[in-house]
Amino acid sequence: MPFSRRDFITSTLASSVAVGFSKDALAQESAENKQTTKRAAKLPIIICAANGYNYLNDAYAFLAGGGDTLDAALKVVQGPENDPNDESVGLGGHPNEEGVVELDACCMHGPTRTAGSVGGVRNIKNVSLLSNTVRRHTGHVMLVGEGAERFAVAQGFQRENLLTDKSRKEWLLWKETHSDWWGPGLDNPDWRQRYSGATHASEWDRRIQRMEQVAADIGIPPELRMDAIRCVIFPPTGTIHCSALNAKNEISGCTTTSGLAWKIPGRVGDSPIIGAGCYTDQDVGSAGATGNGEENIKVAGAHTIVENMRHGMSPLDAGMDALKRIVRNYNGDKERLQFVDMIYYILRKDGAYAAVSLWTGYEVNKPHQVAVHDGTRRLENAVSLYSGASQSWPPIRMLR
């Protein structure tokens, strides 16, 4: 349902107050993190990011019928990859700053203890399947860029234009009105020079009116303009991870993404990194991530979580520990952490599972969720370390 400029301003200011300008609120850990880890009612079980919810039924039926765990997980993530309306993966994914879609993916097959990965792939839609092809048909683990694309074509994958008209127009809107990735990052002492966000409704209104004018000139339909503006101001970091466990306690996982919207060409995030965006150990369990890839790489999040479980932590505690390592990298500085978010999806080989996030959600009243199917398909809220909504990096700046 389209939302108005007033709705956008109200929700944005609410997020700023909850995260950017209320240190007391920021310092409070979510009461939800006192919850306990949940356990599947029965095996098999599949867990994934919320954008995989619509694809769980077929994958679960396949898994329950004796299908391979990795094949089941791949069935889930192919759904968003094939959906042009899901702009976080595959076809229709948001492009880099030059308007080119670059995709990343990895997979791990627990029963055979093998892995495959691809990064910076152009013109190939189902990079999750491509990562599995690397796993099955090469002696390598990771292929990137042009080499990965050539390998895909040699293996029978079809080249296709992944940039939809909708994503192209959103990229044009970003190109004309917003910022780029050149300049200091959050871990640079000079990070503040990039932070001059608006905090008053009148300033937001001026900015958004200007962006609406540009959106109209570009040809974005009226009912889609506020959605496009949101994508520009808050660059999506969407991804999908999926882990699947069968009745024999065999487990596998995979992660696929189009990466951070408007990224510098060649940027590779955590999704294709074995041990960051995805990690599976047949003896322990599986974990994956969505959110700020750079921060997850620094803590090797998925590997950290699985190793925590190996040493006796519950899925919930293992995930919270990984989040706290991200917090430690910024010495607990909430002024910078407001620009970071991370969601971990965790499945232990006995069917215990959890989903944890650094912040409640990208909006205060819309918590991060995990999709689960153990005979009953459902969405559950992630357990957050901190209450409040995160913001995107780079921060909002004055429009040109």
What are the roles of these predicted feature ranges?
Residues 3, 10-13, 17, 28-400:
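Alpha/propeptide regions of enzymes that mature by internal proteolysis
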Residues 22-27:
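Boundary at the C-terminal end of the N-terminal hydrophobic targeting segment
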